[in-house]
Amino acid sequence: MSAQDKLIKPSHLITMDDIIREGNPTLRAVAKEVSLPLCDEDILLGEKMMQFLKHSQNPVMAEKLGLRAGVGLAAPQIDVSKRIIAVLVPNLPDKEGNPPKEAYSWQEVLYNPKIVSHSVQDAALSDGEGCLSVDRVVEGYVVRHARVTVDYYDKEGQQHRIKLKGYNAIVVQHEIDHINGVLFYDRINAKNPFETKEELLILD
């Protein structure tokens, strides 16, 4: 039984046990494009990946299943070398602590996503980045594009082009890196992890 066959079984919930860690060669491979129209197995895998993200952000389910919270997951992280990513970016409560009207600012499974253009300006998260496949803390600014335009297919096989900036742009670049065999710490300056250039936008 392949990794994908196991993951898409109706009874299976993706947990941290399914997520491979740094050192596994799948994380350093360039993943293969999925065939269109999508097969049922690839659609199911995307749904399972999104289910994992929702569970990871739900305190009750996360504790029950022992999950680390995540806003994105790429198929190579569950040992499936395909160009499939899921993103689930929650909206935060307002300054008074009221819950947001919409739970998520972005919720999508992207098949064969590709960055087709990007800003000249770079950006990095002030707190750095983490990864479900990396169990250690790696400090430093992960330098990425401040704005990106991404082409992708949804589970219906419809093609989309989306322009992203800020945190959502960072998230999609992190996940697209995964399908290209790149890990976030590859983008940290090894000699000066917190190096700031004049044009670098630091996002809180």
Swiss-Prot record:
The active site is at E175. One of its GO terms (molecular function) is peptide deformylase activity. Its cofactor is Fe(2+). Its EC number is 3.5.1.88. GO terms for biological process: co-translational protein modification; translation. It is an enzyme of class 3 (hydrolase). Fe cation binds at C131, H174, H178. Keywords: Hydrolase, Iron, Metal-binding, Protein biosynthesis. It catalyses: N-terminal N-formyl-L-methionyl-[peptide] + H2O = N-terminal L-methionyl-[peptide] + formate. InterPro entries: Peptide_deformylase, Peptide_deformylase_sf. Binds 1 Fe(2+) ion. PANTHER family: PEPTIDE DEFORMYLASE, PEPTIDE DEFORMYLASE 2. Belongs to the polypeptide deformylase family. Removes the formyl group from the N-terminal Met of newly synthesized proteins. Requires at least a dipeptide for an efficient rate of reaction. N-terminal L-methionine is a prerequisite for activity but the enzyme has broad specificity at other positions. This is Peptide deformylase. It comes from Streptococcus pyogenes serotype M49 (strain NZ131). The gene is def.
